[in-house]
Amino acid sequence: MNYNDPLEPAMIITKVLSKSDIVGNVVLPKAEVMSVLTRMNVNDQDLLNGVEVQVDDIMEDDLYTVTLKVSGIDKPKYYFGTGWSTMKHSLDLSEGDVLKLYWSHLDNKFVVLNFQYSVLPLMIPV
């Protein structure tokens, strides 16, 4: 992924985490996931069984493997199952936090966009 190129808004998934997302599996916004799925090489049957995807935290240099699944046919719900618990604890996520992921179709993985910006103090020589 070239981090100097602008991000495609259609490849971003944003979710404000609820208590149930923290206690169990995180349910992802349907419209945003469906937009990302246009670039992933998966079909409905793959998602029913679960597809392992990588999630890259480039700030901490951590790579997570989570299972992206769908439940239900009439009203599908997309969620991260296996691997989500490890990822949420490592990212120190809690209720009310915003999870923001970018699907990098060239790298075939999600990239965490939850950057914690910090400013180094200005050092003035005396």
Curated annotation (Swiss-Prot):
Nucleus found in the keyword field: yes
InterPro entries: B3_DNA-bd, B3_domain, DNA-bd_pseudobarrel_sf
GO cellular component: nucleus
Chain segments annotated as coiled-coil in the UniProt record: none
Keyword annotations: DNA-binding, Nucleus, Transcription, Transcription regulation
Source organism, top-level taxon: Eukaryota
GO molecular function: DNA binding
Main location class: nucleus
DNA-binding region in chain numbering: 20-118
Chloroplast listed as a keyword: no
Subcellular location: Nucleus
Protein's UniProt name: B3 domain-containing protein At5g54067
